[in-house]
């Protein structure tokens, strides 16, 4: 994809326009993440942003699908079947996410060098939005609900070009 690629999604334009305006202000990663989170809270799309088939997810693991990509940010849907989870990881850039359905249970960690220290947990429910920026963004996410979970993630990078929002996967003991 080139500098800006809109993947036709009815209803996405108000979110794209708002994020473009915020990103153009060059507020810094953490402030950008929090400002985009405020916008996403007001403009979080509904389930109809995905087709019924896309909302089914996959039995093989959660599915990330780019909805919009630009050199400065990407909008990605993530679909999780019950019990599906990520590995422990951090990100290449700031991130904001909003929950459309399901419950995303997030466990937060701090890298202590030879191990990870669990520093928090949160259950993110439909309508809830959060944002963060590296460093300090190490987490694992799991759909703990009995239904398919759908969330919208906004990353401060072109993940269609990078292939992923993940910077590093952590395989350290947790204490």
Name each model feature, range by range.
Residues 52-82, 129:
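A short glycine-rich, His/Asp/Glu-containing loop-to-beta-strand
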Residues 141-145:
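Asparagine-centered strand-capping/turn motif at beta-strand->loop junctions
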Residues 1-46:
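N-terminal leader/capping segments at the start of a protein or of a new domain
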Residues 154, 161-175:
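Domain-scale activation on soluble regions of proteins
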Residues 93-110:
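Glycine- and acidic-residue-biased ligand/ion/polar-headgroup-sensing regions
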């Amino acid at each position: 994809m080139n500098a800006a690629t809109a993947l036709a999604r009815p209803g996405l334009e108000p979110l794209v326009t708002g994020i473009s305006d915020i990103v153009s202000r060059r507020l810094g990663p953490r402030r950008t993440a929090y400002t985009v989170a405020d916008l996403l809270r007001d403009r979080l799309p509904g389930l109809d942003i995905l087709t019924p088939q896309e909302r089914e997810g996959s039995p093989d693991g959660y599915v990330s699908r780019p909805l919009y990509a630009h050199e400065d940010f990407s909008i990605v849907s993530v679909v999780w079947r019950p019990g599906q989870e990520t590995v422990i990881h951090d990100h290449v850039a700031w991130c904001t996410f909003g929950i459309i359905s399901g419950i995303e249970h997030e466990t937060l960690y701090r890298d202590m060098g030879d191990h990870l220290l669990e520093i928090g947990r949160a259950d993110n429910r439909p309508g809830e939005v959060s944002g963060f920026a590296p460093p300090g963004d190490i987490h694992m996410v799991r759909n703990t609900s009995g239904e398919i979970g759908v969330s919208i993630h906004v990353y401060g990078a072109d993940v269609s070009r990078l292939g992923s929002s993940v910077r590093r996967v952590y395989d350290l003991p947790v204490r």
